[in-house]
Amino acid sequence: EILGVLGIARDMTDTKKLEQQIRNSEKLASVGKLAAGVAHEINNPLGGILNCLYNMRKGTLSPSRQEEYLASMEDGLRRVQRIVRQLLDFSQQHNPELALADINQVVNRVLLLTDHLFVPHRVQLETALSPDIPELMIDRHMMEQVLMNLVLNAIQAMRTGGVLTIRTSMDEAHCLVRIQDSGCGISSSVLPRIFDPFFTTKPAGQGTGLGLSVSYGIVKDHGGEIRLESEEGVGTTFIITLPGQVQAA
């Protein structure tokens, strides 16, 4: 016999707004980490362009040499343009929007923005991106944020340099993205808390403790999962599993 019915309704609007604000603040934190290096990356081609202009103004260059200088200047400007566009696109706030996207292109966009960090941190990059992955139904901007956070964390974990390996592959109906570093590793005692909000193993002032929590939420929103394998003194591997999306013929 049914004696009554209890109904509970919760307005999740404020919660969703807070989640979005946290994601945006974490994205801005990543942009801050990138800014100085991106400025250096832009300054190099600009210096080359100024040098070309200086030599061309002398009026002593042969026509063929002038063409070489003009081509070099154009290449430098296009590189600056590409970097600025990528950074602006990454930093802007976007409404969540699922669409078919190439996960390998998402990986490469993140690597383009972080490329300038590898040499000064003595990090060797290795990639193995499978060409057999179908386009996935994802929010490209959110997945860029997840991968950006994991790449930046990996670089920070390799204090004396090391190898960063990024792999993509298919496992039956799922896409796997692996981000592996040869850094300091994570103690087994803190592994259960690694995705908790505000938990960080970094020194005070060097991390918000939100990056992995935000990444966890984004991957979950995509119907996927994120886990890690780590051993102190050996390194850490983050494994993202996303539902495969096969396009209709």
Placement of each model-derived feature along the sequence:
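Short loop/turn elements at sensory-signaling interfaces that couple input to output
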Residues: 1-5
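Sensory beta-strand/linker motifs that couple input domains to effectors
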Residues: 8
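Core catalytic ATP-binding domain of two-component histidine kinases
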Residues: 13-14, 36-249
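Sensory-domain boundary/capping and coupling elements
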Residues: 16-28, 33
